[in-house]
Structure formats: C-alpha cells, structure tokens
Amino acid sequence: MVSETTKSSPLHFVLFPFMAQGHMIPMVDIARLLAQRGVIITIVTTPHNAARFKNVLNRAIESGLPINLVQVKFPYLEAGLQEGQENIDSLDTMERMIPFFKAVNFLEEPVQKLIEEMNPRPSCLISDFCLPYTSKIAKKFNIPKILFHGMGCFCLLCMHVLRKNREILDNLKSDKELFTVPDFPDRVEFTRTQVPVETYVPAGDWKDIFDGMVEANETSYGVIVNSFQELEPAYAKDYKEVRSGKAWTIGPVSLCNKVGADKAERGNKSDIDQDECLKWLDSKKHGSVLYVCLGSICNLPLSQLKELGLGLEESQRPFIWVIRGWEKYKELVEWFSESGFEDRIQDRGLLIKGWSPQMLILSHPSVGGFLTHCGWNSTLEGITAGLPLLTWPLFADQFCNEKLVVEVLKAGVRSGVEQPMKWGEEEKIGVLVDKEGVKKAVEELMGESDDAKERRRRAKELGDSAHKAVEEGGSSHSNISFLLQDIMELAEPNN
C-alpha cells in the first residue's frame, strides 16, 4: 500500500452511504480504494446495514487498511416505521418510502455529535446524494463535502441539462411524446417518464425531498463518479465542466474486489453455494450462458415474470435467473412447480432464489451475455466483465443507462420496454414484453449475426479499457490521486 497522505497529517474521510443495497456496495468499494492510498476512513451507517458488510470490511481491516465502521441508531419509531426497516429493500410498501426518508434526515443530530468528537478531525465528507442533511454538517464544521450519486456521467449530465431546461418537460403534450435532450454530445430522445424522477417530479412530499437533494448537490464541493473516462469521454468532459472541474471519475470501483471471497460477498450473503454455482457454469460452453438479474428492487408483476421465464425457456439457451425478493413471489414459486417450468429447464437453467455472487458469475468464461435492469452498478459490472447487455430498465436512471449502452456504446440490445414500472401500479401496467419478445431479444444478443459479433467485440474492448483505467497510470487511478491532492491543499492551514 502506497500512502498518498503525509504521515504527520493523514487525511481522514468520513463516508455516508445511503441505506439501499445499490448505493452501499459501491460506497464500501470507494472506502477500500481510498484506504489503499493511506486515507483514514470512517464509514457511518446503522446497525442492520453495518451487518451486511461486516465480513468484507473485517477482511479489509485485517489486511491493514485504516477503516473504521461507526454505527448510529436508526430512528424508525420516530418516523412511523417498523423495527429492522433500515434499508430500502426492507420496506414492505411504497407508502413507507417517505417516512423512511424522514427517518434518514433525523440522523442529522446524532451524526453532528459524532463529527464533533472525531479525532483526527475529518478532512472531507463523502456523502450519498440521498442524504442532504450531511450538507448542513459540512457547512457547520467547514469541511468540504464530496457527493456520490451512484450514476454515470451520461445520466448526471442529462439530469443537469433537463433541470436547466425544465420547460421542455413542462411543454410535452403527453407522457409518450418524445423529446431530444438539448446541448448533448449525442442525439438522444426520451419520453418524460423515462428521465430520472429527480428531474421531473410533481408538487408534494416527494418534491420537497428531491428539492433538498438538488440543493445539496449544488452546494457540494465536488462529485466522485463510479465510471471511467474511456467509457463516456464526451460526457465525462462536459460534466466536469458543469462542476467547475470538481468531478472525478474513479471507477469501476468494483474492481477493488480481487479475491474470490470479496467478489462473492458484496452486500447480502449469496443464497447459493459459490462452488455449486461455479461447478454449474464450468459444465457449460464458453460464452453460452445468459445471466439474468433485474436488481435488488425488481417490481415486475407476476404476469411479466411468467413471460420472461417462458421466453428464456423457448430461447433454448442456458441461463442463470436470479430472482431477488423471492419471498414476495409465492405465486411464482407455485407456478414454477405446478406448470412444470422448473422441471423442464433443470438441465439448462439455474434459478437463484435470492442473492447471487454476481461478480463471480459475470467474470466466468461460460457467461456470454447479461439481461439487466440497467441499474448503474450492474451496467458497469457487465461492461467491466466485457459482456454485451440485454437491457430491461424499470425506473430511475435505468432508461438513461439503456440509451448509453445501446445507442452510444453500441454494446447492447433493447428488450423493448418503453415505460417505467410505477410502484403500486405494476399489475395495472402488466406485461410489457411477451415471451416471443424475450426469445427474440435473447437470440439477437446471443446469436451469431454480424451485429451480435460486433457487439461482443465492442463489449470486450470496453471491458479491457475498464481494467486499464484502474491500474497505476490509468485514468481512474490518476483521478483518485488528483482528488486527494485537492483535499490535501484545502486542508493546509493557510487554506
């Protein structure tokens, strides 16, 4: 480990991950990357969330990395939540989302006391975009705050442009009308419902929550982005200009996981034995397996999940299908059994009911494609593994990420989903892609057409670039150095 901070006054970064699996995983990776450079790291979270990362962090600490995990009690009672509801994926209904965000902001007072007592004094706060209360703490103690969105530069720039041109969204005649994003490096079209909700949200509690996030974004010192310059060069350049030079692409941060245990155990413990999974993959032909995972907060209705399953079956290709939140899909379990689906696909399909060792699976040579919900972590992990993607966006930034992968990078195939899944309206929305559509998209991705071969070549090229970016001398490795230098200069007494 090469320290990039002085021994007399080491930098001390305090990290605040948002309590959602897709936000916490990269923040823990960022903690390890910074600690490898000699930065003292304190991660602030709640007991239930700390337990998810205990093993990964213990291994990091035992290896000599200066990481400390501090826990604060989550005020679930004060917000009207149930005990244990400390993470987005633990909420049983959409109605609990607003109380959850209120509970998060109740953490300001206990966290402020923590910061007051910290020794050494924090040099910098790195906070998730969804925790605007940290801006007040940064201002009170005059500590620079770096923001982490968990999105790529393409989406961040898109959100910035649309906030500045709000009238474009206001003037649309319907939610299905297409518009072109102005002042963008590439010509990209969306409908109003496909853009991230932070960009366009009606009045009410949600607007108040997002307005607080936007204000915190605009008052932060800078932004770190889990991406790399070679992936989206024009967007990284333009977004850095928007942030007055204070935007650093430091990814893919997942590549800090170099040993099998860390790859297999990111966040929740896997619900399949690692050796069993690898043995199954070893039995398949090189590049033949489609990995299917629609994220930690998949809200597809039963009717759509059935069509997805039947389409995978009819594709006649080997697949791994991860279904998270399995306990919520009892009817699907019954259908698997009663319809004979599980019996019919047992030699060709592997069902993982819960969490999977995603990085291990994606990096296995038998895997040749990834059907993803286009959450940024999964999108980037697929790209890093050099795999072409079959895109199935659900909500939030996911339609943005689909546009980047399919239209800009030319490394993916669309499933055909045109509208987001609204929480509470899933059954009303129903089936967006039938089994024939699924089968056709799988064939387009995994087949032997010239276009499919070109996508695979392009995906491998991007994967190689991702690995080079984090090596010494690579763009992301260098950007971490630039970030640390910037904060060191701020920490000097005369500054």
Curated annotation (Swiss-Prot):
Residue ranges of the TM segments: 146-162
InterPro entries: UDP_glucos_trans (IPR002213), UDP_glycos_trans_CS (IPR035595)
Molecular-function annotations in GO: cis-zeatin O-beta-D-glucosyltransferase activity; glucosyltransferase activity; quercetin 4'-O-glucosyltransferase activity; quercetin 7-O-glucosyltransferase activity; trans-zeatin O-beta-D-glucosyltransferase activity; UDP-glycosyltransferase activity
Subcellular location per the Swiss-Prot or TrEMBL entry: Membrane
Matching PROSITE patterns: UDPGT
Topology of this chain in the membrane: Single-pass membrane protein
A GO BP entry: cellular response to hypoxia
Residue numbers spanned by region Disordered: 446-477
Tissue distribution: Elongating hypocotyls and root-specific. Expressed in the vascular system, in meristematic tissues of the root tip, and in the vasculature of the hypocotyl right after germination. In late stage of flower development, expressed in petals, and in abscission zones.
Triggers of expression: Rapidly induced in response to deoxynivalenol exposure. Weak induction by salicylic acid, jasmonic acid and 1-aminocyclopropylcarbonic acid (ACC) treatments. Not induced by cytokinin treatment.
Positions annotated to bind UDP-alpha-D-glucose: 296, 356-358, 373-381, 395-398
Primary location recorded for the protein, binned into one broad class: membrane
EC number(s) stated in the UniProt entry for this protein: 2.4.1.-
Entry keyword set: Glycosyltransferase, Membrane, Transferase, Transmembrane, Transmembrane helix
GO terms for cellular component: endoplasmic reticulum; membrane
Pfam families, per the entry: UDPGT
Annotated Basic and acidic residues bias: 450-471
Family: Belongs to the UDP-glycosyltransferase family.
Chain's role: Specifically catalyzes 23-O-glucosylation of brassinosteroids, resulting probably in their inactivation. Also, involved in the O-glucosylation of trans-zeatin and dihydrozeatin. Active in vitro on cis-zeatin, dihydrozeatin-9-N-Glc, and olomoucine. Possesses low quercetin 7-O-glucosyltransferase and 4'-O-glucosyltransferase activities in vitro.
Protein name: UDP-glycosyltransferase 73C5
Species: Arabidopsis thaliana
